[in-house]
């Protein structure tokens, strides 16, 4: 998770302790989505705690994600290089891929190798929140593609920006 699907920017210093353990409840929640409109409002109630960052990890990200009823994890996408792994902790989510849909409950997991052109995302179609761990490596030069939406990410001297597929910025 190197930020191709950015979230709101917040400054966070990991707690200074003698041990490398972190209480997830002490890690600030990032709510909402970094997508531009009209995509942002489609995400619903999504909260993410960047546990890997809180532990000082730099080569891969680990996020504790909570999806409220009706929320989705992201727009359906695939990565050119980033491997992604998800492990469901509570509730039920529906994994939507190019091949269809599959319900995942507690203890189930899914993985997406980088470069595999199988766009995916999760939707919480249940009546209660669902939580899962999301793990992804951080590879410079990774890009994400969104087959269902007019969205791409670009990068210039000012950082990452959202654009239409024809290059016009949002």
Please identify what each model-predicted range represents.
Residues 64-68, 79-96, 135-137:
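Short, conserved beta-strand element in jelly-roll/cupin
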Residues 99-114:
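Short acidic-glycine-tyrosine-enriched beta hairpin
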Residues 68-72, 92, 101, 116-117, ...:
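Short, charged/polar surface micro-motifs in flexible loops or helix N-caps
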Residues 3, 7-59, 144-170:
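A short, N-terminal "cap"/entry segment at the start of jelly-roll beta-barrel domains
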Residues 56, 114-142:
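Ligand-binding loop in jelly-roll beta-barrel domains
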Residues 58, 96-100:
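Short strand-coil-strand connectors
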């Amino acid at each position: 998770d190197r930020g191709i699907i950015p979230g709101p920017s917040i400054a966070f210093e990991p707690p200074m302790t003698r041990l490398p353990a972190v209480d997830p409840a002490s890690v600030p929640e990032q709510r909402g989505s970094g997508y531009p409109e009209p995509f942002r409002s489609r995400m619903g109630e999504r909260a993410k705690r960047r546990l890997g960052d809180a532990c000082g990890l730099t080569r891969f990200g680990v996020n504790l994600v909570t999806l409220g009823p009706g929320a989705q994890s992201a727009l359906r996408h695939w990565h050119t290089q980033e491997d992604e792994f998800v492990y469901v902790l509570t509730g039920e989510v529906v994994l939507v891929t190019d091949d269809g849909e599959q319900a995942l409950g507690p203890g189930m997991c899914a993985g997406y190798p980088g470069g595999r052109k199988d766009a995916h995302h999760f939707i919480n179609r249940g009546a209660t929140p669902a939580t899962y761990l999301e793990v992804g490596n951080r590879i410079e030069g990774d890009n994400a593609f969104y087959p269902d939406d007019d969205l791409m990410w670009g990068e210039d001297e000012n950082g990452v920006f959202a654009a239409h597929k024809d290059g016009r910025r949002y």
